[in-house]
Swiss-Prot record:
Annotated coiled-coil segments of the chain: 27-62
Biological source species: Mus musculus
Residue numbers spanned by region Disordered: 128-150
Residues in C2 Aida-type domain copies: 156-303
Subunit structure: Interacts with AXIN1.
Any one Gene Ontology cellular component term annotated for this protein: cytoplasm
Molecular function GO terms recorded: protein domain specific binding
InterPro entries on file: Aida_C, AIDA_N, AIDA_N_sf, C2_domain_sf
Region entry Axin-binding, spans: 153-220
Keyword annotations from UniProtKB, A to Z: Coiled coil, Developmental protein
Lineage top rank: taxon: Eukaryota
Residue spans of biased composition, Acidic residues class: 128-137
Similarity comment: family membership: Belongs to the AIDA family.
Name the record gives this protein: Axin interactor, dorsalization-associated protein
């Protein structure tokens, strides 16, 4: 083990212990910050492409799973409900795994998957990577470099049902855009945020759109909300960020976003308005994307025992 890797593992371990200490002391804001910062570092290492990494692909996958667990614990702490989806005792099981990552060869104790790297971008950070441009213009020409292989989609299964509790399935049918046919490998990132823009559930990405025609990009994919409707905090909203690949700049950009508030949760079809980027999770400065009648088309199904 090189000195650089030894130092890296020590820093990660210290950060995990700090977060767990804050967590056990009830200092939840500090714990969430520590968990999210560490998750960001772990995700970057898990997705790193540099050749001088001492971590194997399998070890990187484990590092990515630890990052996912940190995100889950962070989301659990932000919930107002007493039931915690990912407990502190669970989190503490990660410390020896992270410490011994170079020799760890057992099955990971939790059924989670690494989150794609782009999920760790802070709100607005993605947009800061590019110059302002006219979004009414084309999205550029030329084939992406195996982009679909880089974005497999991260949809999660439906939660177990509980008596008296409601689960929500949202089918993303299609989105209306003036230049729909020019969007390369489009997909939608779905997240649930409180009024402060903090995640209440794990973030999910759809697979790349199934087809494009005229002014529509079709998805026809189901999103399972990762929290019972009754357990969502007051003022929460479900966000849908439409993203596409820009070959000239070689990164993924958010084109527009939409959101649905809690009073809009009801069975059946719904169309919601599209807003200009950057995504405003706090819903303070909203600007419609276009005056044209173009929307995000959804269909909701509620499941209650």
């Amino acid at each position: 083990m090189s000195e650089v890797t030894r130092s890296l593992l020590q820093r990660w371990g210290a950060s995990l212990r700090r977060g767990a200490d804050f967590d056990s002391w009830g200092q939840l804001v500090e714990a969430i910050d520590e968990y999210q910062i560490l998750a960001r570092h772990l995700q970057k290492e898990a997705q790193a492409q540099h050749n001088n990494s001492e971590f194997t692909e399998e070890q990187k996958k484990t590092i990515g799973k630890i990052a996912t667990c940190l995100e889950l614990r962070s989301a659990a702490l932000q919930s107002t409900q007493s039931q915690e989806e990912f407990k502190l005792e669970d989190l503490k099981k990660l410390e020896p795994i992270l410490k011994n990552i170079l020799t760890y060869n057992k099955e990971f104790p939790f059924d989670v998957q690494p989150i794609p790297l782009r999920r760790i971008l802070a709100p607005g950070e993605e947009e800061n990577l590019e110059f302002e441009e006219d979004e009414e213009g084309g999205a550029g020409a030329g084939p992406p470099d195996s982009f679909s292989a880089r974005v497999p989609g991260t949809l999660l299964p439906r939660l177990p049902s509980e008596p008296g509790m409601t689960l929500l399935t949202i089918r993303i049918e299609k989105i209306g855009l003036k230049d729909a046919g020019q969007c390369i490998d489009p997909y939608i990132t779905v997240s649930v945020k409180d009024l402060n823009g903090i995640d209440l559930t794990p973030v999910q990405d759809t697979p790349v759109a199934s087809r494009k025609e005229d002014t529509y990009v079709h998805f026809n994919v189901d999103i399972e909300l990762q929290k019972h409707v009754e357990r969502l905090t007051k003022g929460a909203a479900i966000f849908f960020e439409f993203k596409h690949y820009k070959p000239k700049k070689r990164f993924t950009s958010t084109k527009c976003f939409a959101f649905m508030e809690m009073d809009e949760i009801k069975p059946g079809p719904i169309v919601i308005e599209l807003y200009k980027k950057p995504t405003d999770f706090k819903r303070k400065k909203l600007q419609l994307l276009t005056k044209k009648p173009l929307y995000l088309h959804l269909h909701q199904s509620l499941h209650k025992e």
